[in-house]
């Protein structure tokens, strides 16, 4: 709140039934010992946009969730460049692309709080245009995860994909 005005709102699902429902919709398979939380929407008042509020609230959520959960799952629209950049900056990895919420295309992203599963091997990474859904899905199927958004002068935005340590 700022001067009695709500600046931002963010949702998070931590209960097992809620997270299982989201994971089923996203078609995400996790290890048996994982206990994920799932973040939903984050809205920021127009007056406060551009001040990293989404980024800061994401870290606040992580402080709460990391105590009792092994990972955090979220989705971002491929059309939301700033939101995608914020989430990737928070060390999330793109692990899927799926139509959810009534047919809207979303990147499915995961952040693992277990240190042994965080590394990616950036040597030999792939650079895929953000609009090339099939190339991204192929990379994910081959064990790559999206980790960075880059802007190319002539060809627009691309996502860097690297092999995950477990792959």
Where are these regions (language model features)?
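Conserved active-site alpha-helix within GNAT-family acetyltransferase domains
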Residues: 67, 78-97
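Conserved acetyl-CoA-binding loop-helix of GNAT-fold acetyltransferases
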Residues: 41-66, 85, 89
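Conserved beta-strand-loop-alpha-helix junction that forms the acyl-donor binding cleft
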Residues: 44, 73-84, 129-131
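Conserved acyl-donor/pantetheine-binding loop and adjacent beta-alpha core of acyl/acetyltransferases
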Residues: 5-43
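Intrinsically disordered, low-complexity, positively biased terminal segments
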Residues: 95-167
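Conserved GNAT acetyl-CoA-binding A-motif
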Residues: 65-78, 104
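Short coil/turn motifs at secondary-structure junctions
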Residues: 15-17, 47, 79
């Amino acid at each position: 709140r700022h001067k009695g005005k709500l600046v931002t709102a963010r949702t998070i699902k931590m209960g097992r039934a809620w997270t299982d429902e989201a994971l089923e919709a996203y078609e995400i398979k996790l290890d048996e010992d994982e206990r994920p939380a799932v973040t939903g929407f984050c809205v920021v008042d127009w007056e406060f946009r551009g001040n990293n509020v989404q980024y800061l609230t994401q870290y606040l959520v992580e402080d709460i969730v990391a105590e009792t959960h092994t990972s955090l799952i979220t989705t971002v629209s491929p059309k939301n460049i700033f939101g995608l950049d914020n989430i990737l900056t928070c060390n999330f990895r793109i692990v899927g692309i799926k139509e959810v919420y009534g047919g809207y295309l979303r990147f499915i992203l995961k952040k693992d709080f277990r240190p042994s599963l965080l590394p990616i091997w950036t040597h030999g990474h792939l650079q895929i245009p953000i609009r090339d859904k099939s190339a991204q899905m192929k990379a994910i199927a081959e064990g790559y995860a999206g980790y960075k958004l880059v802007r190319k002068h002539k060809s627009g935005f691309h996502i860097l994909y690297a092999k995950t340590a477990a792959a």
